[in-house]
Amino acid sequence: MGGNVGLSKAYNKAVESIDGRDGYICFFDDDTAVPENYFALMEKEIEKTGADILLPCVFDRNGYMSPCKISGVSVSAISSLEELNEDNISGINSGMAVKAEVFKAYRYDENYFLDFIDHKFLSDMKKQKRKIAAAKSVELKQSFSANDFSDIKAARRRFAVFKKDYSLFCRQAGGLKNKLIGALVIAKRFININFIGRLRSK
């Protein structure tokens, strides 16, 4: 594709290269540990739920990373799958299984480079009345670098990408409340990197 053009463009290129629109397409990050029985378990979850989109249970060192809850532009972790419903469910792309037919008339928003591509996608799918479900029996482990501030310079570069993508997500969501929440989230992450992260590294 010629250099790092962004994850959304890479996803679209991959989707376009797949022949046919039967079955499901599964997405994985390179920092996600995938168990050998992933596909067998996911197939059972598809049969059980009949969902268009299935989100496995992805864990990082703090607990559930995905699925998660979303309210407007505010994303928060869950402690139990019982907290989820069809309105507030969201999650990350890694491990996600999507019915191939979904992409007959959908492409990822290429204005996003790396962050919030998944939340934007799931928001769009809710508008299309697609069924989204948690694949309760499928568990993955994730090493997520966005919250690692041990390398301040790398964290600042990562923050610049996050800020651009999340600001776009907030603008597209619209409304003063969402813009204010977005500004607070960005400010909090900036402080964590430039002040708290620096103190921890000393």
PLM features: residue spans?
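Glycine-rich, basic loop-to-helix element that forms the pyrophosphate-binding segment
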Residues: 2-19
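Acidic donor-diphosphate engagement hotspot in glycosyltransferases and nucleotidyltransferases
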Residues: 11, 37-39, 117
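Short beta-strand-to-loop acidic/aromatic patch adjacent to the donor-nucleotide binding site
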Residues: 22-33
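Conserved donor NDP-sugar-binding/catalytic core segment of glycosyltransferases
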Residues: 37-68
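A recurrent flexible, glycine/aromatic-enriched loop bordering the glycosyltransferase active site
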Residues: 79-98
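A short, conserved alpha-helix in the catalytic core of glycosyltransferases
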Residues: 91, 95-96, 102, 106, ...
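Active-site donor/metal-binding and catalytic loop motifs
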Residues: 134-153, 165
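Non-catalytic, C-terminal membrane-associated alpha-helical segments of glycosyltransferases
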Residues: 153-202
